[in-house]
Regions:
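N-terminal pre-domain/capping segments
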Residues: 1-128
Length: 129
């Protein structure tokens, strides 16, 4: 390997040592599409199981210190769930990251959320983000 290639490789390797990825909580649950769900025996079904799985991924990779949450799927009681989430963060050593609102599932979002033709729906979506 030529010196410049070696230096480029070392630079890339060093950058990867500090690279971090936020993993989505829903990546540990059953998955699917609008056409159906793909059920997996080991899929996480609670937020604690998701934190446990995220902790294992972070332990193996060292590059996933945060997990994005979904407001309806992970925080069904809204802000009342936050103390329990903080406990899970401490227990599993993974922090919460982005809190994603549900701006896609309901019928009102058939034509989008922030770009919906309805001013009322766009306004509601803006309040959620």
């Amino acid at each position: 390997m030529a010196h410049s290639e070696s230096a480029a490789f070392e630079k890339a390797a060093k950058a990867l040592d500090t690279f971090q990825i936020e993993i989505p909580s829903w990546g540990f649950a059953n998955t699917g599409t609008r056409f159906g769900k793909f059920v997996q025996a080991a899929a996480a079904s609670t937020i604690e199981e998701k934190f446990s799985d995220a902790s294992e991924v972070h332990h193996l990779t060292g590059s996933t210190p945060t997990m994005a949450l979904h407001v309806l799927w992970d925080l069904p009681n809204g802000v009342a769930d936050i103390p329990a989430v903080h406990d899970l963060e401490r227990k599993y050593g993974v922090r919460s990251g982005a809190i994603n609102p549900n701006l896609f599932q309901d019928q009102e979002y058939k034509f989008g959320s922030l770009c919906n033709p309805s001013a009322e729906i766009r306004k509601h979506a803006m309040r959620c983000v």
